[in-house]
Amino acid sequence: MMIDNKEILKSFSGSAPLFALPNFVMFPKTAYNFNVFEPKYKEIISDILKTNKLFCINLKKDNSKSEVNNIGTLCYIIESKKLDSGNYTLIASGIKKIRINDINKTKSYDIAKLDLIEENDTVTEEQLKRKKLINKFISLVASSNENINLNIIDTSMISTEMLTNLGSLILPLENEDKQKLLELNDV
């Protein structure tokens, strides 16, 4: 399913509910399946499904209950299903890198005031860099313990930015290292 990020961003008001996660970094132009079972996050999903389906994911800082990294990703719910238990399964797509300006507690969850971060996604010598990146990505994934079918990735349809972010998302890196990759200014 192709989504139009520019169209989705038209409904962005400058703030979004905050998913502060202790062990996950989301990247723009990637998608991820979530099982939502905590009451606070179920309330967020219930609320945003009634509006623009936007929320932001930020990695919690080490051993912190409430402090989050300033840089995260604005996400859009592509697909969701409410289970009989009240839990949700959903697929979210990373839309744009964001910076948190302020956090307001309005309900049982936080709403973050956000700035969209414009990235330098111009890649010089695009084809050569893509080829090197694809080869490195395939060798790293093949050498990991992950059981990933690399044939499902159509690299001809993937931008260099998307490929870089996909690699950052699925490679077996520490979350702090993934956060550092998310905070980089360009591909």
For every predicted segment, state its role.
Residues 1-187:
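N-terminal low-complexity, acidic/polar interaction/targeting segments
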